Amino acid sequence: MDKNMERDTQQGTISQEAPADSGVSRRSFLRKSSVAAMAAAVGSQIPFGDLLPEGMQLVGMAHAEEAMKIEGKIPEMVVLNTKPLNAEPPPHFLDEDITPYNKMFVRNNGIPPVKVDAAAWKLTIEGESAKRSVSFSIAELKKKFKEHTLQIQLECGGNGRSEYNPPAKGNQWRVGAISCAEWTGVRLRDVLEHVGVKDNAVYIGYYGADTHVSGDPKKVVISRGVPIAKAMEDESLIAWAMNGKDIPLLHGYPLRLVTGGWPASTCGKWLNRIVIRDKVHDGPKMTGMSY
C-alpha cells in the first residue's frame, strides 16, 4: 500500500489568490496582504510596511511560508492556495525528461481522501450509453486488460493565468502547472469496449472520491469529461502508477484518468466512476466559465 495514501496533505488555510479586478500586481497584493495580516496579529501597524520593496519580506512572513511546505515536494514549490491545495514549482525546475513527483504541480478542486483502501477500491462504468453497468477492482483491471506505460504531458488549463491581461479570476498560476511523467495502466478504450458502448454514445464523464471544500458530502467537486472519440484514443488511460510506482495520493491514488493532449482537468483523480453519456457531459465545472 502506498505510504503516501494516509497522509493529510492540506497545509494551512491561507489563500494566496489576488482579486482579478485588482489594479496591483499579484506580488504587491500578496506582500500588502501579508503585512496587513501581521499588523492585525500584533495589534499595531508595521512601520513602513506598505513601502516594503519587491523581493523583500518580513522575517515573520518567511516563517509563515515555511509552514506551507508540502511533504514530499521541493521546498521551492509556490503554494497558490491551501483549501483546496494548489501549488507549482518554479519553471526552471522542470528541465528533466521525466517529471519526478517532488517537482510536479498540484491542482486540486476539493479535498483529497485521507485514507484509501486500494484492495477494496472499485471503479464503476455505467451511464445511459453503456450497454451494462460493471464494477472493477484494481486487481481485476490488471488481470483483464493489457498494461501500457506512456509518457504523457499534463497541463492545467489555467497555466500562465497570472500573466493574463485583463486579469482573470482563479489561482494565479505562473507557468509551472505542467508535467511530463510516465503513466502505467490500461487503455480506457479496452475497458469501455468490455462494458459495451451504445451507438448513441457522445461523451464520457468521470467522478472521484475527493470531498467538496464545503465539507458537504452531497456536493460533487468536479466532473468533467471528453468526447467518446477521445476516450477511444490510444493515449487515454486508466492509470494506477506514475513513474513506476503507485500514484501518490496528491496525484490521484489509487486510480486516475490520463487523457493526453487535453487539459489536466479531464484527467480525474481518485477515480471511482465513469459514465458513458448520450450527450455532452454536464457535470460540475463542465461549463465554459469553469476551468
Labelled PLM ranges:
Residues 193-230:
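Gly/Pro-rich turn-and-neighbor structural signature
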Residues 221-247:
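Acidic, His- and aromatic-enriched active-site or binding-groove loops in soluble protein domains
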Residues 1-28, 51-56:
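N-terminal secretory signal peptides
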Residues 254-291:
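Catalytic cores of secreted or luminal carbohydrate-active enzymes
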Residues 19-23, 44-99:
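C-terminal segment of N-terminal export signals and the immediately downstream linker at the start
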Residues 149-177:
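Short, conserved helix/loop micro-motifs enriched in His/Cys and acidic residues
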Residues 25-46, 188, 257:
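N-terminal export leaders
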Residues 177-184:
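Mid-length scaffold segments of soluble, non-membrane domains
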